[in-house]
Amino acid sequence: MSKKALVLLWTAFAACAAMAQVEVTDAWVRATAQGQKATGAFMNLTAKKNTRLVGVKTEAAAVAEVHEMKMEKDVMRMQRIPSLELPAGKTVSLKPGSLHVMLMNLKEPLPVDSHVQLTLMFEDADGVKSQQDLHLMTTLKGPGADSKADGAHQHH
């Protein structure tokens, strides 16, 4: 086997291995009403080794960012975060009212039971970059949602 073929094979193997480094579960996007221009995507992320979520892309919105919500002087604030640490073996939950993927300037409404494709971009502790494509269903409440989560993204 030629040296070039070995390099290509190793690169393909490394990319596949890197893609499998983060398990995504319970992923969903909050459905929108007519005229609504923003919504959230939620999921649980579990990395096999220390990794960071460094970006999100989608065709459904002009802007896709990781956001966090936190209390500052009795006011709940939402802000973009440049990356999200995913410690090895620990599940990081992106959920309403907390960490989440914010989809802004939606190109069209996202009714219940429609599909949204997201691409998550990761970088592990060794600097290896990977991405993972997700096909998410839209719903009003995600798996295991309770009444406290209702409307958490209705005012963006």
Where are the predicted features?
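Compact, glycine-rich, soluble single-domain proteins
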Residues: Q21-H156
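N-terminal signal peptide c-region/cleavage motif recognized by signal peptidases
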Residues: A12-M19
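A ubiquitous, low-specificity "background" feature that marks scattered single residues
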Residues: L9-W10, D74
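Intrinsically disordered, low-complexity repeat segments enriched in small/polar residues
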Residues: L6-V7, A14, K49
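Bacterial N-terminal signal peptides that target proteins for export
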Residues: M1-L9
